[in-house]
Amino acid sequence: MATALTSAEVFVALVVAAHAAVLALRLSISLYEA
């Protein structure tokens, strides 16, 4: 990948990844406790 990412794009990507990780963690916890 030779595309230059701007700081805004990197920030958005990190936020989206963080939300996805939190949702996956909460889902796994709810399934584990069920």
From Swiss-Prot:
The chain crosses the membrane at residues 10-32. Keywords: Membrane, Photosynthesis, Photosystem I, Thylakoid, Transmembrane, Transmembrane helix. Its main location: membrane. InterPro entries: PSI_PsaM, PSI_PsaM_sf. GO terms for cellular component: photosystem I; plasma membrane-derived thylakoid membrane. This is Photosystem I reaction center subunit XII. One of its GO terms (biological process) is photosynthesis. NCBIfam families: PS_I_psaM (TIGR03053). It is found in: Cellular thylakoid membrane. It holds the Pfam family PsaM. It is a single-pass membrane protein. The keyword Transport does not apply. The keyword Transmembrane applies. Belongs to the PsaM family.
